[in-house]
């Protein structure tokens, strides 16, 4: 269904269309604020076009799965909020755009004092209109070790309001009437965008900023500004290793290594890299005219998505990644990054690298479809034939379900590499999903359950086509 069809279908327009408009507006704003991000988008588009030309079979798979039309749309952004009230209201804001909180991520064990969720659409149809999602992190003030600093940070955050009056009015209107009409949707996008805009003026003195940054640079990024500026946007590539190699050639300062699994024939989950965050001028509350402070937080990211893994597959992935990092003593450094890549590839060699094998071992999620041979045999297919038998007979085929979520270790690695300063070890704190959900105002959805439902729905539809 086209976006124009959605808009004319009813008085209140589709939340998916509002999300598509918001995503485009966000991209335009970020390219103006961070021109280097525009350069990154052009590089990714070039690499994708070259990849599709050289791999027509991959292009056919993407076209069949409806992934091709949305390939060059930004896939996600990220923000960090400071209070439970901000988190609860941001949930309501994203709900206007059909975005739901999916999964709980605790980044504290990886040395980042936040816990997070991803706001995204949850159906293939909605993703087809706009795949945009936002990784949203809530600062864990209880992890600030200095009591006086913790209380000061809480007081600073309590004074700010990150939403315009117009945004709050339109959120309430959408909730009251079950959506927004076309004109109000445009007003909403304009008003909501202000929450994510960059502000050069800090809300703290230079000394307060330094005290927050000394505790953790992310704490300063959350507390010291008027709102949760978007800290990165992310296009999708089909060949992240080529993008990583070409960034320095284009004058783009790339982070040290690609986060996530190694390069494979059958991509797993999510691989990410970025250009390093900009060192930007800011003004503290006690600065004189002509003086400028510095802040490092905003960057451009690239992602390459692979197949979603089952709980069994994810457990194996986590085990292998932990083993690779233990081999080099933690996250890769300039001194051992080549060794890390070699160890990662060697250790992951035990993870099957063919979709048929991953499916047979229950490691990944797949869509099912009836083949032309299967449709021709409809009505004569044995009622007790297993899915494996139907696949072996060529009556069913599988296609990998794209992983639409995130990886906490990778997210932490991206954050750490773009905040500057010395990376710290993990916080001695337990995950607290219950507290996060209380602050959010609802339970997060299970990403595993969503993939399972999607897979089973496709299987039932395919079996019906076989006359089962």
At which residue positions do the language-model features occur?
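Extended, well-ordered protein cores
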Residues: 2-468
């Amino acid at each position: 269904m086209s976006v124009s069809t959605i808009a004319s279908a009813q008085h209140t327009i589709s939340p998916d269309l509002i999300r598509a408009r918001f995503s485009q507006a966000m991209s335009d704003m970020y390219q103006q604020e961070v021109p280097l991000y525009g350069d990154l988008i052009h590089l990714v588009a070039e690499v994708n076009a070259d990849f599709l030309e050289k791999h027509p079979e991959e292009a056919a798979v993407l076209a069949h799965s409806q992934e091709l039309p949305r390939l060059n749309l930004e896939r996600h952004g990220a923000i960090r909020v400071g209070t439970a009230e901000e988190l609860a209201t941001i949930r309501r804001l994203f709900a206007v755009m059909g975005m739901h909180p999916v999964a709980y991520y605790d980044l504290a064990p990886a040395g980042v004092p936040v816990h997070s969720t991803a706001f995204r659409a949850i159906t293939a149809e909605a993703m087809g209109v706009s795949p945009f999602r936002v990784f949203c992190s809530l600062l864990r003030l209880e992890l600030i070790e200095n009591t006086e600093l913790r209380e000061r940070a809480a007081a600073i955050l309590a004074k700010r309001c990150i939403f315009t009056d117009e945004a709050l009015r339109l959120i309430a209107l959408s909730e009251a009437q079950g959506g927004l009409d076309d004109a109000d949707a445009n007003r909403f996008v304009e008003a909501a965008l202000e929450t994510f805009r960059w502000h050069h003026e800090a809300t703290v003195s230079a000394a307060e900023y330094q005290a927050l940054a000394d505790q953790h640079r992310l704490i300063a990024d959350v507390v010291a500004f008027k709102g949760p500026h978007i800290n990165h946007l992310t296009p999708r590539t089909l060949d992240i290793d080529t993008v990583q190699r070409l960034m320095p050639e284009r004058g783009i300062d790339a982070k040290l290594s690609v986060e996530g699994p190694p390069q494979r024939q059958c991509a797993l989950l999510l691989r990410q890299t970025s250009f390093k965050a900009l060192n930007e001028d800011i003004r503290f509350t006690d600065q004189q005219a002509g003086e400028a402070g510095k802040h490092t937080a905003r960057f451009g990211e690239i992602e390459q998505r692979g197949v979603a893994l089952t709980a069994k597959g994810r457990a194996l992935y986590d085990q292998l990644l932990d083993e690779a990092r233990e081999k080099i003593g933690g996250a890769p450094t300039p001194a051992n990054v080549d060794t890390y890549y070699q160890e990662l590839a060697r250790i992951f060699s035990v993870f099957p690298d063919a979709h048929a094998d991953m499916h047979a071992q229950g490691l990944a999620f797949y869509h099912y479809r009836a083949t032309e041979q299967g449709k021709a045999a409809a009505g004569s297919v044995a009622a007790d034939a297993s899915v494996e038998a139907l696949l072996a007979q060529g009556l069913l085929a599988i296609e990998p379900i794209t992983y639409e979520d995130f990886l906490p270790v990778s997210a932490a690695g991206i954050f750490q590499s773009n905040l500057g300063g010395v990376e710290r070890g993990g916080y001695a704190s337990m995950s607290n999903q219950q507290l996060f959900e209380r602050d959010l105002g609802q339970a997060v959805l299970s990403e595993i359950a969503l993939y399972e439902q999607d897979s089973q729905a496709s299987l039932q539809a395919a079996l019906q086509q076989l006359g089962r």
